[in-house]
Structure formats: C-alpha cells, structure tokens
C-alpha cells in the first residue's frame, strides 16, 4: 500500500504518541528533542518522501556505479585542478603550485632503496623488539593459532562487509532507487543483567518497505530454542517442539501502539495485560492502541531515532529496540532485497562449558543431582551420559535433567 494511505495509527506530533488524527503536522522530519539522545517523533514514509523530493538531480538517487574517468587527458585535467586549488589556498602562482606538486608529491615520498617490503622484518635487524615480533609471527604461522582479540576483529569485519555491494541474481529482487534503510539495534533480553542496558545483541539493516513481521522473524533469541520438559528417564527422546513452534505470540511497541503478531490462529494478544494495567486506576499513560504487525511496514511508523522501544516474545522475553539511523540506499549497499533484514553486527557470546571436562559446551542442566557438586549443574552430552547412566542406558540415582540451549549457539 502506498505510503500515507494506510489506515491505522498515525503521528499526532504531541508527546510522540501515535493517535488517530488527520495529518501528521510537523512530524515529517526528525527534530532533536535532546542532543545526542533521541529525536522527536516523525513519520518514516513522509520523511522519505521529503528526502526524495529534495534530491531531484540526475544521479542523486541512482544505484548505478559512478563511471570511472577514462577520457584522454583526464589525469592532466585533475592535476590542473589540484594546482589551482593549491594556488588559491596558499595564495601563490600556478607555477609555484606545480613545482610544489613535483617536489612534494607522493611519488617523492619513497625510500632510497627499492624493493623493500615494509611488512617484512629484515633478517639483519639489531632491534630486540623486532626480533621478538618476528619470532611471534613465525610461531603463529607454524601453529596456525589466532589470538582471541584477532578472531573477534576478523569476526566483526566479516559481519559488516560480507554483503557490501552485493547485487541480486534476479533483477526483480533489486532494491528500488530512493528506498529507505533503517539501522536497528536489538539489545539483550532484560534477564541478561550484565549487558541489558548498553550492549546491542544484534544490529540489523531493514528496508522501509519491509513489514514488521520480517524483522520479527529475523531476530534470533535463545529463548525461542528452549525445550520444555524433563528428560532424565528418556534422554534419547527427540523433542517434538521448541518454544518458537509452541508460543508464536509477539509484539513490537512503537510510540503508543502495540503491533501484535496475529499471523497464526494460536497467537494471543500479549499487549492486552499491559493495556488493562495502564488503564486501571488512571495511571496517566494515556490510551494505547493495538494493530496487527503483519499489516504495517516501517514506512507506516512514527518513530524517534535513538529512543528505546520494545520487542516482546515468548510471553515475557523482552528486548529493548533502538532505531539509530535512517538513510537512503546507496550503490555500495547490499542491493539484494531478499537478504534484508541484513545482520551486520552480532555480539560474541561466551559459552558455558561442561562442569566435568571443561572443554565442550553444556547440553544438559540437572537439579537435585546427587552426582553433581552444585545445583544446578551443567554437562556436555558425553559427560552427562557417562556420569548418570550405565552401559545399557539405565538411569543411576535420582536427578532431574533438562535440555540446555547455550546462548553461544548463535556464535
């Protein structure tokens, strides 16, 4: 549906709440309420229209690669322009500027000895620090080990650059010129007290024309993979369902409106309890609205950049969501629509190791376990079975065993 033509919550421009009024007033562009914190509420689609209306020049919105200067004499023309700029800045003649370029050019900043690679440590060095560095690099190449800091830097770089400039094989999947891209930070669930307020769990790029359900389906959370039930008597039994299959309800909260996922018959309105609580005893929160998540795109929303919003799923697993940036698509961006929402950052999580071997990631957690030194206690699959069952698979002792899904699963 075209932007601005959809019925439902719209910006009122008052208090940032989406109230059903005609027109969006002065909230079509982000105005900063507090510096470096968040903007005032604005309508995403209207803001995009204003942006596209200003960029009417040839090539302003084009996603084609800029042509390389391949005309004869273009290099000489560039040199002339550089000389003119230097002459203007230094208030000197063109001849003096040309002489400065010839004497102080980059091609003059070379060592006297040719053929030396600055990345290679020479053999006959007398510096102790270079000798230590050389032995360290040789040891790394021999053992093929990479320190943790280097691994994380490589991981972050690959996440950010893996889709840069990627174009679709099918032209129908090409992003349209003038499309909006929003940067969304999904923070840790509130139960992660260490990181819940300041560490983004995931950072994604979403298109303004994408539905809220597409972002909802792309958010990975360990609570969706939990397996219900106690399996001490049947450890080999394969679970029939995970939490994501059983509890499909979820909602986003943006500017006074709860967008509930109602795509499936078993979905419930998780926001109803919050709305009833806010309306009881006149708590002063005003009147909230509800809408169907699958009926709205990001272009239909009123948002504040830098403002904390909410994503709730699995009944009570809550993630703070912050939209940090909004911009037009560029030719260097990933232009394949099918890859969005595009994950560009993901926090590296420590995995919980088995209490026995201290090597493998935990797969089981036990309670009231006479064989364990602590309660609860975590085990990998091998140690769990060796400690709690005999060679024929019979249970030894009394304990309760539950499948454990480690948050580091998404590493």
Swiss-Prot record:
GO molecular function, one term: DNA binding
GO BP annotation list: snRNA transcription; snRNA transcription by RNA polymerase II; snRNA transcription by RNA polymerase III; transcription by RNA polymerase II; transcription by RNA polymerase III
InterPro entries in the cross-refs: snRNA-activating_su3 (IPR022042)
Record's keyword terms, sorted: DNA-binding, Nucleus, Transcription, Transcription regulation
Chain's role: Part of the SNAPc complex required for the transcription of both RNA polymerase II and III small-nuclear RNA genes. Binds to the proximal sequence element (PSE), a non-TATA-box basal promoter element common to these 2 types of genes. Recruits TBP and BRF2 to the U6 snRNA TATA box.
Similarity field: Belongs to the SNAPC3/SRD2 family.
Name of this protein: snRNA-activating protein complex subunit 3
């Amino acid at each position: 549906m075209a932007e601005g033509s959809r019925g439902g919550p719209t910006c009122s421009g008052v208090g940032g709440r989406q109230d059903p009024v005609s027109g969006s007033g002065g909230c079509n562009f982000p105005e900063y309420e507090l510096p470096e914190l968040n903007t005032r509420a604005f309508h995403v689609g209207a803001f995009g229209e204003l942006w596209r209306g200003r960029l009417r020049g040839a090539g302003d919105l084009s996603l084609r690669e800029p042509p390389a200067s391949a005309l004869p004499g273009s290099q000489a023309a560039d040199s002339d322009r550089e000389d003119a700029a230097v002459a203007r800045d230094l208030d000197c003649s063109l001849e003096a500027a040309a002489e400065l370029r010839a004497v102080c050019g980059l091609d003059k900043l070379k060592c006297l000895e040719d053929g030396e690679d600055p990345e290679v440590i020479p053999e006959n060095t007398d510096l102790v620090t270079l000798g230590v560095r050389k032995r360290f690099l040789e040891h790394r190449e021999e053992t093929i080990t990479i320190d943790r800091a280097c691994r994380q830097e490589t991981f972050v770089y690959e996440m950010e650059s893996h889709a840069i400039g990627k174009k679709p094989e099918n032209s129908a999947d090409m992003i349209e010129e003038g499309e909006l891209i929003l940067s969304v930070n999904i923070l840790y669930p509130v139960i992660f007290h260490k990181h819940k307020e300041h560490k983004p769990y995931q950072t994604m790029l979403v298109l303004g024309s994408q539905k809220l359900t597409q972002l909802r389906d792309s958010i990975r959370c360990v609570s969706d993979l939990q397996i219900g039930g106690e399996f001490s008597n049947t450890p080999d039994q394969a679970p029939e369902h995970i939490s994501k299959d059983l509890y499909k309800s979820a909602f986003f909260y943006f500017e006074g409106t709860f967008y509930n996922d109602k795509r499936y018959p078993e979905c419930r309105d998780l926001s109803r309890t919050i709305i009833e609580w806010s309306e009881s005893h006149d708590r002063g929160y005003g009147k909230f609205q509800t809408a169907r998540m699958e009926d709205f795109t990001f272009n239909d929303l009123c948002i504040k950049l830098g403002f904390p919003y909410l994503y709730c799923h699995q009944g009570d697993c809550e993630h703070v969501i912050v939209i940090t940036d909004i911009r037009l698509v560029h030719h260097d961006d990933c232009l394949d629509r099918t890859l969005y929402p595009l994950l560009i950052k993901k926090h590296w999580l420590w995995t919980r190791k088995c209490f026995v071997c201290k090597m493998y990631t935990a797969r089981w957690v036990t309670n009231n376990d006479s064989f364990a030194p602590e309660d609860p206690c975590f085990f990998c699959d091998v140690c769990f079975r060796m400690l709690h069952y005999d060679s024929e698979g019979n249970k030894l002792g009394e304990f309760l065993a539950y499948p454990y899904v480690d948050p580091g699963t998404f590493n």
